[in-house]
Curated annotation (Swiss-Prot):
Gene giving rise to this polypeptide: metK
Gene3D superfamilies: 3.30.300.10
Reaction(s) catalysed (UniProt annotation): L-methionine + ATP + H2O = S-adenosyl-L-methionine + phosphate + diphosphate
CDD domains: S-AdoMet_synt
Annotated InterPro entries: ADOMET_SYNTHASE_CS, S-AdoMet_synt_C, S-AdoMet_synt_central, S-AdoMet_synt_N, S-AdoMet_synthetase, S-AdoMet_synthetase_sfam
A GO BP entry: one-carbon metabolic process
Keyword list, A-Z: ATP-binding, Cytoplasm, Magnesium, Metal-binding, Nucleotide-binding, One-carbon metabolism, Potassium, Transferase
Function: Catalyzes the formation of S-adenosylmethionine (AdoMet) from methionine and ATP. The overall synthetic reaction is composed of two sequential steps, AdoMet formation and the subsequent tripolyphosphate hydrolysis which occurs prior to release of AdoMet from the enzyme.
Protein name per its UniProtKB record: S-adenosylmethionine synthase
Subunit structure: Homotetramer; dimer of dimers.
Amino acid sequence: MTYNKRLFTSESVTEGHPDKIADQVSDAILDEILKDDPNARVACETTVTTGMALISGEISTTTYVDIPKVVRETIKEIGYTRAKFGYDSQTMAVLTAIDEQSPDIAQGVDTALEYRDEASEAEIEATGAGDQGLMFGYATNETDTYMPLPIFLSHQLAKRLSDVRKDEILKYLRPDGKVQVTVEYDEQDKPVRIDTIVLSTQHAEDIELDQIKDDIKTHVIYPTVPESLLDEQTKFYINPTGRFVIGGPQGDAGLTGRKIIVDTYGGYARHGGGCFSGKDPTKVDRSAAYAARYVAKNIVAAQLAEKCEVQLAYAIGVAEPVSISIDTFGTGKVSEYELVEAVRKHFDLRPAGIIKMLDLKHPIYKQTAAYGHFGRTDVLLPWEKLDKVNLLKDSVKA
């Protein structure tokens, strides 16, 4: 029996990928600042390349952070500890070029437009959005984590690849690596099997490709991917170029915010374009994307839809979102209008409301900077909680 199959592919990268190094450094600096100054304004950008890291951006804070020390410690944790790896946390140069946040932006963020116009602190205690923009959140019931299977498995494989390196199960592995998973979906849009796995890992020079292929299957793929999803037709491409010795920042420059699809839903849902890392929670690029995921996940967990995408949009200096849009792709049990009204009732989607609702003024961000911001099974993140399920169910009944 044949059916109309559909293939979908997502990718992830390891913590040693140059762009992910940059994300982790930016978020490590953010976390270090938030430890002492939860109200700091941070927009921290990192560039890494051979022998150096450049930290730039705008930071307004009352605390002091030894930025070069944070950079070196973060890169050491990732595993770049020897010059022969092409990047050494101890001998690399760290350059900084930090300014304060623009007072024009601060005016809109510190006191929302509604408050400045109406001068009614009792009515509106809100932080204005730090920028205009649109953000998306998504959830699906195809996995227990409410994530699309391709990106979920890509993250699991990338994390496992780093774990076997750090645990010295495969001592010849180096920090840089990428994973790509292609999943086959049936006519009911349910995942049925894995069609292709692509995995590239940096390695020591004196190792044979055949051994890498065997070891990766034995220690990374088979312990991670459910056996039921693999079959004789599944294709494996492991280090398909044949050699991956030069990697990390020596092989490619890395920048904060260059892996926004890896960070979110692997291309399965739309993206507003703004990155997360290095930004404090007054930046709606980050906080509103987390809130949109929180909303979508609770809608799907409440069984009001099988899949759900939420769009939020903001104007700089204005607290209330200018629009809330929900798409259930024909799987909704109630109308999308009803869902929007229920969301307006039970979720405070003003920037200050999001920060309070999700308790975002804490140093929780570095752990999100590799292996995805959503659907994590190894860390507890506030936007993944399912505490609005019953409220949503009751709201649409009424």
